[in-house]
């Protein structure tokens, strides 16, 4: 595709008030982020508009529905409202195009994928793990690793969401069933530095706070930073790159 063999992209879901801490941490290590923000979230507090605007100056903002609701539980009319209205409201707040969308809870149907595209989003980000191959992204953008220590059962279940087997083989054989996110990140990066690829790190600031993962995350970001052979992109920049619309 071009000489860049390793890409780092990150994304952060739910628009929680501690996303500002995430943004500052990313900026400390010159790493780009895409923040997927719902208009409202009845589970936890969403950041105020002034903070959202502040974060948007250096990072990408993406849509995450109006009410942070699982789209596959809604009828077509309600799902279309959640998708389209979140885009409109964010664009009104920020005065810029919103191109990226993330499915709350990673829940979606083929209908929802179509609605996301019809609303004018370039893609919908999922929660599927262990994707590291640099290849065109059309409708769905999968991820590499979540900042969370999942059980092996959960990690395998996420792998099984895929319609192809490479993430399952990667987890069982290359990553040897490890469940610690820091150890998994080290193994993924070892593989990337050898073979090239993309590392898409994602998570929730509320979860990082709840489980005390800030130090581990900072250590990881520090290790990811300042490599001349790595391209640091937000999610939409990555989409443009793999679809041959961005030259680095």
Kindly give the residue locations of the regions a language model identified.
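Short active-site oxyanion
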Residues: 8, 98-99, 228
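Aromatic-anchored helix/helix-loop segment that forms the rim or "lid"
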Residues: 157-186
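Soluble or luminal CAZymes and related metallo-dependent hydrolases
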Residues: 18, 47, 78-85, 108, ...
């Amino acid at each position: 595709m071009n000489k860049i063999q390793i890409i780092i992209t990150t994304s952060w879901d739910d628009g929680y008030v501690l996303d500002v801490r995430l943004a500052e941490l990313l900026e400390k290590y010159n790493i780009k982020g895409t923040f997927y923000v719902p208009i409202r979230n009845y589970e936890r507090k969403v950041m105020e508009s002034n903070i959202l605007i502040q974060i948007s100056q250096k990072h990408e903002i993406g849509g995450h529905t109006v009410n942070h609701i699982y789209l596959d539980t809604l009828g077509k009319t309600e799902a279309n409202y959640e998708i389209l209205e979140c885009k409109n409201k964010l664009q009104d707040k920020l005065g810029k195009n919103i191109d990226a969308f993330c499915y709350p809870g990673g829940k979606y149907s083929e209908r929802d994928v179509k609605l996301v595209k019809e609303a004018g989003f370039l893609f919908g980000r999922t929660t599927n793990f262990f994707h590291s191959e640099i290849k065109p992204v059309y409708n769905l953008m999968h991820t590499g690793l979540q900042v969370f220590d999942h059980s092996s059962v959960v990690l395998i279940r996420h792998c099984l969401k895929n319609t192809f087997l490479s993430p399952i083989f990667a987890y069982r054989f290359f990553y040897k069933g490890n469940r610690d996110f820091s150890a998994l990140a080290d193994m993924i990066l070892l593989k990337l530095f050898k073979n090239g690829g993309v590392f898409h790190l994602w998570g929730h600031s509320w979860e990082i706070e709840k489980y005390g993962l800030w130090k581990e995350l900072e250590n990881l970001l520090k290790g990811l930073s300042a490599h001349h052979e790595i391209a640091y992109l937000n999610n939409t920049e990555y989409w443009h790159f793999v679809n041959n619309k961005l030259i680095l």
